[in-house]
């Protein structure tokens, strides 16, 4: 049920997994390349920092760092956090030259400004804090 909306917007499960009922997670998840592209085009018009978390459901380090990503999204509410599964969106992973998971690509105005490969929570948090302004 809800196939068309689930395809366009993705399932809401991952987007709210680390949140509470009154406060859902701020990490967006896209299961559709078209929906991702719409979001990417919209955000590149702003000066807002975008953190793209390329992960996979089978990736242990990806699952390990996920709670920290949700905490960062709550802490840095002026930053846009997006989680993309490389198996669901291989074309987007290829476009960003992602070859290992997790890979975090930090983007501003549509341009990559930083890349972190691996579950390096402290490094990611420092870079997000520095680049969000």
Curated annotation (Swiss-Prot):
Thioredoxin domain boundaries: 6-133
Family membership noted in the UniProt record: Belongs to the thioredoxin family. Plant H-type subfamily.
CDD domains, per database record: TRX_family
Cross-referenced SUPFAM superfamilies: Thioredoxin-like
Function text: Thiol-disulfide oxidoreductase probably involved in the redox regulation of a number of cytosolic enzymes. Possesses insulin disulfide bonds reducing activity.
Region Disordered, residue ranges: 1-22
Alphabetic keyword roster: Cytoplasm, Disulfide bond, Electron transport, Mitochondrion, Redox-active center, Transport
Subunit and partners: Interacts with MDH1.
Residue pairs linked by disulfide bridges in the UniProt entry: 59-62
The keyword Thylakoid belongs to this UniProt entry's keyword annotation: no
Positions of the record's site feature: Contributes to redox potential value: 60-61
InterPro entries on file: Thioredoxin, Thioredoxin-like_sf, Thioredoxin_CS, Thioredoxin_domain, Thioredoxin_H-type-like
A single GO cellular-component term on record: mitochondrion
Source species of the chain: Arabidopsis thaliana
Lineage: Eukaryota, Viridiplantae, Streptophyta, Embryophyta, Tracheophyta
Site (Deprotonates C-terminal active site Cys): 53
Keyword Transport: yes
Pfam families, per database record: Thioredoxin
GO terms of molecular function: oxidoreductase activity, acting on a sulfur group of donors, disulfide as acceptor; oxidoreductase activity, acting on paired donors, with incorporation or reduction of molecular oxygen, reduced flavin or flavoprotein as one donor, and incorporation of one atom of oxygen; protein-disulfide reductase activity
Protein name: Thioredoxin H2
Organism superkingdom: Eukaryota
Localization, UniProt: Cytoplasm; Mitochondrion
Active site, per annotation: 59 (nucleophile), 62 (nucleophile)
């Amino acid at each position: 049920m809800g196939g068309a909306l689930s395809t366009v917007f993705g399932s809401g499960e991952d987007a709210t997994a680390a949140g509470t009922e009154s406060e859902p997670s701020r990490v967006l998840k896209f299961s559709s390349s078209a929906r991702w592209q719409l979001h990417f085009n919209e955000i590149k018009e702003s000066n807002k920092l975008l953190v793209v978390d390329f992960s996979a459901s089978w990736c242990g380090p990806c699952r390990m760092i996920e709670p920290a990503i949700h905490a960062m999204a709550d802490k840095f509410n002026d930053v846009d956090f997006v989680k993309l599964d490389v198996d669901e969106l291989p074309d987007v992973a290829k476009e960003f030259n992602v070859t290992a998971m997790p890979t975090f690509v930090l983007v501003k105005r549509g341009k990559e400004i930083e890349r972190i490969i691996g579950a390096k929570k402290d490094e990611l948090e420092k870079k997000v804090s520095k680049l969000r302004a």
